[in-house]
Amino acid sequence: MKKFTYSILIPSFNGLTLLKKHLPTIIKHSQRVDAIMIVDDGSTDGTVEFLKKEYPKVKVLHNRNNFGFPKSVNLGVRNVTTDLFVLLNNDVSVTNGYLESAIKRFDNPKVFAVTLNETTSSWPQVSWSEKLQYVRGEEKDRAHYSAWASGGSAIFRKSIWDNLSGFDEVYSPGYWEDIDIGWRAWKAGYTIIWEPDAKVILEHESSFNKFDKNNLNLIKQRNELVFYWKNITDPVMRREHLHYLLRHSLTHPGYLKVIIAAINKLPTQVKNEEKLTDRQILAMVNQPFS
């Protein structure tokens, strides 16, 4: 296995309680890491003061304002100087050996990211029927190619991340930015792997739980449409998606609000070279990795 340098990046907004709970475990099981960095997204709960006092070796980047997840991650990655970086939500705990089993996958220079095994879940089995459909894959003990790497628990190759221009901040405050960069990576000829032995525990306590549920649902649906309109270029798939929009708008009149919100987010500037088509990506993901 090649020797890589790697760091850990944790974006956090008013996550003092979560960091107190999960950071000790991350430090314990990440002994060979070169650096641990917290990007504090304008917290008002004493996070920065706590970290400086209790964890002086942890680097803290403090945003004066709340920028949202995609921009905070991008700001953090600009300060990463290692070959790889581990992106973790502040509500994630890790297990012993989670890094070693994933980092070996980067021996292949085409691997952009390795998404970790959130033990209550598995790899996303993706298909297309007027829009992306996915369920959790049943074969949980074997590595698989994955359409994307989770923005809350994955390892990324810094050089490729930079080539792809990072997360597209059009998705702020968050949701679908990880799917977007994953799809762009595949189109550019890179691969993503889900690694079953790299086990982490997701507590589902992130800052997004503090959002109004209706507003959060609007953000999710809006960003989903932005993803399709930006990334899906196959003519047949685009027509199928248009049929879905027309039908869904007629049967769910409130959906027009989602469409308008998505239109207002366009155009987005982050586009990358396309070596693979949408159909080729769909044929490659979901397959076992050997």
Feature locations, PLM:
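Short, acidic, metal-binding catalytic loop of nucleotide-sugar glycosyltransferases
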Residues: 24-33
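Conserved donor NDP-sugar-binding/catalytic core segment of glycosyltransferases
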Residues: 92-127
